[in-house]
Amino acid sequence: MTSIFSSDQIRSQLSVHRIFGMASAAILYLVCLSGTVVVFHNELLRLEQPEVEETFELPAQYHAKIINEYLQRIAPQREALPETVYLVMPTQDLPRPHVTDGIDEWYLDAQGEFLQQPDTPWTEMITGLHTHLHLPHVLGSAIIGLTGVLMTALIFSGVVAHPTIFKDAFRLRRQAADRLQATDWHNRLSVWGLPFHLMIGITGAFMGISTVLVGVLAALYFDNNQEQAIAAVYGDDPVVESRSGSVDYPTALANLEQHAPAAEPIYLALHRPGQTDQLLEIAARLPDRLTYSEIYRFDADGQLINHQGLADGPIGRQVAYSTYRLHFGNFASLQVKVLYAMMGIALSMVCVYGVNIWLSRKKVQGPLRQIWQGWVWGLPAVMLLCLILSWLPASWLPLNLTATFWLLLLLVTAGSALIHRQEH
């Protein structure tokens, strides 16, 4: 197969591919493997706390009572009312309505009565690992975004550096040396999942560094006003002067059904509750659209003000609001999530085989190889061990689950090098 790139360009891209790959392999493997698990986030929430009562209904007549009771419950611990309260509706994959302001949270039954608070430390730990590496959110998200950029760069450099990668898409030298077998698997898994891997890299980069992008946009076009920059992408809130002290949720939902009959509400957000400019937003899924939701705005009387244009606004806004569902496979059936998980495992294996190729090529036999093996096998083992530990009473653990995870992973990885040292 004739390449459109010169031999010098191919050698240059191969060198770039190796440097980027070795520099980012450990974190890429961690992000890919944890992301494979996070695909089943809602299913894991249900499995980790199976005793929670489930329902597919939460009638509008109970919404005001729920919001008011929530505000009363949190008032003694707060200096001021929260800026926004979210009432999350039951869905097919998570039939557990709940109310939260991002700090406290309770599940609800079909009559709006308060049930347990969420107690899913393992799912939260894995999710935090994937989204921000348990670091402060801005820093962690920026690093995750950088891994998406590196993944995208590795995909393009890998394709350029291997002119026969598509021609040899089904070539496996099963009887060859370990390095050649690893090379074949690395290249085959890469090309088989190429569209998926590219999509994951691009969407992950976008979500991870969106905070940084907003800052750049604000600096270039909005005199460092980040709120204006966000409004330019996602739409601004309307100015509301309510005529009512209470919110008419049934009327708002009835008006939504009349305006958009196919819309499926997934959450209600009451902004500035109890104030004269309180605003009700209803986020609703639209059929056959990848956008996470469309957001419809209502005044306290339940009258429709406008919608945010996430599904029919500027194309950039539609794309930005579609990345989450596309990245996590949260747009179709469980079978799609299973397919995402299979692709995620394949992507994790690409990372592993890539490093193994380099170690074999350089004939590395010292502690570096053992540390890598400890990281590869230790990461899933520690994740499973933390799942078992999460079943124990929290008082039995000297550290929280996140700290326990990193301590165990450090011990396993470092222990691999120590074992090698003792053997030699």
Positions of predicted regions on the chain:
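Conserved histidines in hydrophobic membrane contexts and catalytic metal-binding motifs
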Residues: 1-424
